[in-house]
Amino acid sequence: VYRIGGAQAVAALAYGVQGIARVDKIVGPGNLFVALAKQHVFGDVDIDSIAGPSEVIVLADHTARADFVAADLISQAEHSPGSGVLITWHEPLLDAVEGALRQQLVELDRGGLAAQSLREYGALILARDATEAARLTDELAPEHLHISMDDPESMLGLIQNAGAIFLGHHTPVALGDYIAGPSHVLPTGGTARFANGLASADFLKRSSIIQYDRQSLEAEAEGVRRMAAKEGLTAHSASVDIRLR
């Protein structure tokens, strides 16, 4: 365990310094300088992702409590910068959440920072129905998705893109930050469209193993010859033919 941090730690781990051997992979979130340092060393070492600001979408219906929703939006916004977005098809919830946000922000130590984040990166969105709400969520592909409904499982089949999904009124996103168990290193900035959260599989490698005998090689030789001829790579064909003389 090394007591180091920041961009300088990324450099030390990527290239090695006295007392620290270079590594093959660097993972985990950090500030802007850490993110840019990881981007710079990628290729010399592997990385997990370029982590952006924290973000949450709350997908809520008429059963959601406005104070619960507001608390989840603020909890991510207090990272500053952080993004908090509510998508609902129950119009009265928009005004109720806006009022709850104002009340809670003045009561919190980091309320000023969270308020600034919500002004710059927050949104309260009214969808036509649950299907449109799910489509908008998929387009945004959030790091955290909180489905605040009595039957949140009903939305899972409509959602493809989210780093971590929190179901029900009593599953705040903070559980995933600290206690719940699944990876907290999650795709941000819309990258949940193609990326997953960090997992044990990210620390494993695979190698393909191929073995043919002479009979199997003879059966496939003509296919190799034809493709090699198309590409003009005669040595490829020759490496097969020399074994079949």
What function would you assign to each model-found segment?
Residues S75-E78, L86-A162:
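A glycine- and small/hydrophobic-rich beta-loop-beta segment
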Residues A14, A37-Q39, V69, A96-E98, ...:
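Short, well-ordered secondary-structure micro-motifs
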Residues D138-R245:
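C-terminal core of ALDH-fold dehydrogenases
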Residues V1-L13, I26-L36, G112, V173-Y178, ...:
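Short, basic, helix/turn surface patches
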Residues V1-Y2, V23-V27, N31-F33, D48, ...:
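Structural motif
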Residues Y2-G84:
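Conserved NAD(P)+-binding/catalytic subdomain of aldehyde/semialdehyde dehydrogenases
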Residues R3, A7, N31, I50, ...:
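Electropositive phosphate-/nucleotide-binding environments in soluble metabolic enzymes
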Residues S49-E55, G82-I87, E91, D95-G99, ...:
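Gly/Ser/Thr-rich active-site loops/lids in small-molecule metabolic enzymes
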